[in-house]
Regions:
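C-terminal beta-signal and adjacent terminal beta-strands/loops
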Residues: 141-200
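Residues that define the transmembrane beta-barrel architecture of outer-membrane proteins
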Residues: 1, 48-52, 88-94, 129-133, ...
Length: 200
């Protein structure tokens, strides 16, 4: 079920999803008697899982500055006690995104985007707080602004990590990885026939 609505620069959405017999991958002891300490990763179905939440998007414009602020709340509850996975948390996970666009004089354009997702305990997993900041400065050239030169910086503070803790059948695993999205560079774009002139 989903519901969306908007008015001028305000948009909102709500959703609810119920999944039955959802497949999941989880860990359990392989054989405590013959092979103690050996963990087996396997798949099984969970009788009932629920995901629901909502989002609010604000996109006003103040002259040369156009921010877009997104605030969302997410819940996820998946009861895996039939698989002997005992934790059953249902904390809310807030997520905030601020995307700033600045249309500057003389063909300059600046975009700065930041995201912050707070940690939460949901179902039988624990998510850690994570966030990133990206920026791009663009200068347009030529009469029709067909040539664009951009200075790009992705994941400026190298914070784009993913930290995930998950419980299984008498097991506990912790994962952390870095997506290696940090980039600093120059981008060139040229749009042919930018004015859509059929004689060009």
């Amino acid at each position: 079920f989903s519901l969306e609505g908007g008015w001028k620069w305000i948009n909102a959405s709500l959703y609810f999803d119920h999944a039955r017999n959802m497949y999941t991958t989880y860990a359990k002891p392989y054989d405590d008697a013959k092979h103690p300490g050996v963990v087996l990763w396997t798949m099984a179905s969970i009788p009932n899982s629920y995901a629901y939440g909502g989002a609010l998007v604000l996109s006003p414009k103040f002259g040369w500055w156009q921010p877009q602020f997104t605030a969302s709340l997410f819940w996820f509850q998946s009861n895996a006690r039939s698989l002997n996975i005992q934790p059953l948390w249902n904390e809310v996970q807030p997520d905030f995104i601020l995307n700033n666009s600045f249309t500057l004089p003389r063909g300059w354009f600046l975009n700065i985007k930041g995201r912050l997702a707070f940690g939460a305990k949901q179902s039988y997993a624990i998510k850690k707080t994570e966030g990133t900041v990206d920026a791009q400065l663009t200068k347009s050239f030529l009469k029709d602004r067909a040539l664009r030169v951009s200075l790009v910086a992705n994941d400026i503070f190298r914070t784009g990590t993913y930290h995930f803790r998950v419980y299984g059948d008498r097991t506990y695993n912790e994962f952390e990885n870095y997506a290696d999205k940090q980039r600093f560079g120059i981008r060139l774009n040229y749009q042919f026939n930018a004015t859509k002139n059929k004689y060009k």
